Amino acid sequence: MEKKVRFKLRKVKKRWVTVSVASAVVTLTSLSGSLVKADSTDDRQQAVTESQASLVTTSEAAKETLTATDTSTATSATSQPTATVTDNVSTTNQSTNTTANTANFDVKPTTTSEQSKTDNSDKIIATSKAVNRLTATGKFVPANNNTAHSRTVTDKIVPIKPKIGKLKQPSSLSQDDIAALGNVKNIRKVNGKYYYYKEDGTLQKNYALNINGKTFFFDETGALSNNTLPSKKGNITNNDNTNSFAQYNQVYSTDAANFEHVDHYLTAESWYRPKYILKDGKTWTQSTEKDFRPLLMTWWPDQETQRQYVNYMNAQLGIHQTYNTATSPLQLNLAAQTIQTKIEEKITAEKNTNWLRQTISAFVKTQSAWNSDSEKPFDDHLQKGALLYSNNSKLTSQANSNYRILNRTPTNQTGKKDPRYTADRTIGGYEFLLANDVDNSNPVVQAEQLNWLHFLMNFGNIYANDPDANFDSIRVDAVDNVDADLLQIAGDYLKAAKGIHKNDKAANDHLSILEAWSYNDTPYLHDDGDNMINMDNRLRLSLLYSLAKPLNQRSGMNPLITNSLVNRTDDNAETAAVPSYSFIRAHDSEVQDLIRNIIRAEINPNVVGYSFTMEEIKKAFEIYNKDLLATEKKYTHYNTALSYALLLTNKSSVPRVYYGDMFTDDGQYMAHKTINYEAIETLLKARIKYVSGGQAMRNQQVGNSEIITSVRYGKGALKATDTGDRTTRTSGVAVIEGNNPSLRLKASDRVVVNMGAAHKNQAYRPLLLTTDNGIKAYHSDQEAAGLVRYTNDRGELIFTAADIKGYANPQVSGYLGVWVPVGAAADQDVRVAASTAPSTDGKSVHQNAALDSRVMFEGFSNFQAFATKKEEYTNVVIAKNVDKFAEWGVTDFEMAPQYVSSTDGSFLDSVIQNGYAFTDRYDLGISKPNKYGTADDLVKAIKALHSKGIKVMADWVPDQMYALPEKEVVTATRVDKYGTPVAGSQIKNTLYVVDGKSSGKDQQAKYGGAFLEELQAKYPELFARKQISTGVPMDPSVKIKQWSAKYFNGTNILGRGAGYVLKDQATNTYFSLVSDNTFLPKSLVNPNHGTSSSVTGLVFDGKGYVYYSTSGNQAKNAFISLGNNWYYFDNNGYMVTGAQSINGANYYFLSNGIQLRNAIYDNGNKVLSYYGNDGRRYENGYYLFGQQWRYFQNGIMAVGLTRIHGAVQYFDASGFQAKGQFITTADGKLRYFDRDSGNQISNRFVRNSKGEWFLFDHNGVAVTGTVTFNGQRLYFKPNGVQAKGEFIRDADGHLRYYDPNSGNEVRNRFVRNSKGEWFLFDHNGIAVTGTRVVNGQRLYFKSNGVQAKGELITERKGRIKYYDPNSGNEVRNRYVRTSSGNWYYFGNDGYALIGWHVVEGRRVYFDENGVYRYASHDQRNHWDYDYRRDFGRGSSSAVRFRHSRNGFFDNFFRF
């Protein structure tokens, strides 16, 4: 029979205890309550649920008397009940109150059979090994070597059904508060919570609003936050009972070997060796050197982190209890002990700790201090953000540097903008691009870069002892993101080792290129000797906006002629001023950004930057490839073939063909051709045969649009007047292009293409022509025999509307025609070989006919598929297709970066493993295959290309290195891409763990610095030159065998958080294992810490709130984080509230002490301030928020129209700057703000995304009504949109029409509307009405301006006229039959006849409406009228009658 006992529990040394009648072991259970969420912070609405058991081995517990009232009638004599305690009192945030001395509990004893399941939980087991121990009085006794014992504790958690208690909810809102909230517009109460809505109906989030002097805060959900002050009762931890594990959990010794650390610093993922482990969850056993446990199992930086840990681990271990912020430290310690017991049980069962490592790491990532939340703001960098390393940190001196000279771009190489270069008004680039940013200003690093360059250029020799497998040249990646000294180093090396400055042949054989986007880079390179060539970015943009963009975004076509490094109106120079290469797309340009756009729009709108998954990429390409085949494209490029028709026929630049324009970007290498493959291949082959000579381009306005023509005169002819020789006559090419699919030429239009004097009276045939279905290629004279055209005696090809019109199909949105001479030999080759004559002008590369003859092939795509078998590797496929590349005329093959890729997934490059995200720069498939094959495959591919005379280009990527395998602690500051500290960041001279060390066992260890001695001996001049950015030469004295932080400027943020390296918050001191300066959490090292009561956390001392860290230190002049909340404690150690100035910065703290972070403060009058991620108020200047900007002046956020440095800008109600936006401002005026600067536009036209045009006056206001601008009379509707192709009725009621192209008011011209109706506008631009004589024709225009055609018009006197349905001319002397079947006859004055008349010799009758009724009496009964007429203008009528009987009334003959 069950026995129910009533116990009274007494207090012993500030702890509640009850004693088992069977032993001296005390079982203490904690308080019960309701189930809450693990991340709950609402103290008012939630209680705590627990059933953890803590066992305290102290004899003093047995001294306490226990009073029980027996309420049962019988019990077993052998029962040894274990007390199980259930609290009947609901827990509140004062659960640690220790003033009461007794408490009543219901205790349900267990039976003997139940106790048999407890695995000897109350036994002391003797062992053969001595261990350190605690005496009954709490004294710590070292182990005796001759004896040993282990202490066994219970592993049984007695299940308790919690008694649910409802907490009394403290009211944080007074009646005055409620009234104040109710008086504010847009604050509404929804489901018991208050929310503040913006005018557009969206919620204000992270928004502090001052109402009548009191601040109300609306949190990240938009709900009004609870500003209740913390409990005034301190967190008193009864460590001698509730933290009884502490003595065993102390560290074995403070030697660093007993910790997992990074550079002697502890991190959130550090493990350590405790003195004891609770083996199998039962027995405290002295640890071995293999027994490491996570630090977070026994120590936490604050109580909130401990609570989060307990809740997280409970969920992982199947313990169904959670704890809210009202939970006491006593309860959390008990829960943590239960978790530790469970962990040890599982370690024994699993026989490893791998699972625990994964679990702890996963928990760490949930804490804002240890994840990317504390690294905000984001989006100012390709990988969310960058970190700059300190040069003079005392804490991480191993990472210090004397260099880290940032942003030394070609424009800014000396640290000041070079006045010679003004095309780009910026400094021409920025330092931080990706990953570990290499410090290319460091002379030791510069020497290593040279060493690596030499390795690449001699790869075959070094790796395979085969010089035929050496690379010939390089592509320099990301020039605008590295120190420009590297350009001198590379150029000097190419001159010294390859002799590129000696003659054109040497230069062309080692033709190296730059990826340098700034407009200043090309002139800089030219001034440096043209040792390498750069892209013609202006031409790329011209191709993009004239041809590739959607129709409503296209510019005119003239930029294709003039917006380039070369004006091609008449390009007849032997040698261009500046050499260059040109392209329309590349592996990372106009490909990955299109994929990003698709992912954001249709797959994952929350994607940041270029951090895609492979699954997202796969889905995006399904859309991309489908779009490529569409006539109306949403994402992909239009008119790719048109771009290549110009690229491959232009003079004075080396064209580069992109792999992804011939083969699909995804899929196996060269497996799937694109729709543009045939057109590009045809152009490549034709280039060998025809493309040579001078060039002339023209823009012609024809019909309703424009076209451009481009002519190459042929080999030997630089000008149109040159007659050349036989080869001249059979070479040359004409390209005709339009970018308007609605292009229509007028009948009188002629497109005249001057092929030059060498081509008079010559047959030409099409190479490419546009058809309804796409582009038709003609590969021979025979194929195009029926389409031959001849030049006239001036050498002109002439085309008409019959030849040229606009098309819309998947390949062409506009028009393309390419024409070549008939009669060229099949093997004609007009290319020019490079000269070996010495170069004497101080330049290495010259853009002459020989360089023009070259073609580069960028032979890879970022997104090509991973090989599934050996034969699919890129380099294997390349080797098999070298004949094809030679047929195309490829002279320079740009290989993919051949480096084994990182797989960290931190950026697109490491996801797709394209070779740019490497950890070992010397591993070209040596250690294992990369995406493109093995090092041996690379050797074979290079040799195969060389066998066809094709030069091979390596990708030199000196900017970054990814995810190095070894970790290092650095002192870092969160910066933007220029290295400027980011406002609002928590990371300022903060210790941070980076992936900054290479292994020391890789190819870097083998080859790093290995060639420097050889290079010094061969080319000593390279090491004598003082570099521009540093003023000192390279330093070859150090060979970098292992990369480390001292060689980097910094890295991208890694998501480890601002607090990952652990410290004591109160003293702001990092926990360190440095032998002479060891500083560790006290609970790990102090044998007395944990055996007496201690105070931690927020404590009210009667005067104010103070804070004690878990190490027992009081916070003074310190910021303290408790979970996600931050507080500040002043010089006296008291928590502050309200506005505060601390160390020169402004902060704001709510009434409960919580600091405003990432929040707006509204003073109640819509004057806004912003407090950043570090709590500092933003003071002056522009600040980036994601992709948007805000502006602040003296701490006030700009809202509305704001004048800044003389320019007017606009900031919306949330403070975000308008860029590229049309804004109706508070005065009701429409304005536009520039897409780049954000400045208000004035005296300028602007086109919106719909293709509509606006004109903004000198005040920046959109004009409306009629305006004369540059001699044109224009009209702008009330919404500011310019009328184009529209009929507008002016204020006087006059109808006017505005030209669809120019928008100019139409005068003295006919216009037809969409219904086919015609209007005539007079010399004043007004639609005419009534009768008009125009060009000898008498016409009529109705009152709405519509011309009468095929209509009866009744004039004022009721007389009727009729106007021809085709010409609109007034009909005279003709019969007319209307649609109703009635016949009329119009006399020589144009009026319809009425009454009896003799018409064409017959007497006929017309009624009062002019309708023909009958002829003379003798005809009307016997003849049926048969009318035949010619509808031709001015024709005569013919009438005949035939005999017929009909059913008409007598005397009435109806027709």
From Swiss-Prot:
Its EC number is 2.4.1.5. Changing A734V: In strain: MT8148. Residues 1-34 form the signal peptide. Changing R425N: In strain: MT4251. GO terms for cellular component: extracellular region. It is found in: Secreted. Changing T1331A: In strain: GS-5, MT4239, MT4467 and MT8148. It catalyses: [(1->6)-alpha-D-glucosyl](n) + sucrose = [(1->6)-alpha-D-glucosyl](n+1) + D-fructose. Residues 65-104 have a biased composition (Low complexity). GTF-I synthesizes water-insoluble glucans (alpha 1,3-linked glucose and some 1,6 linkages), GTF-S synthesizes water-soluble glucans (alpha 1,6-glucose). GTF-SI synthesizes both forms of glucans. This is Glucosyltransferase-SI. The gene is gtfC.
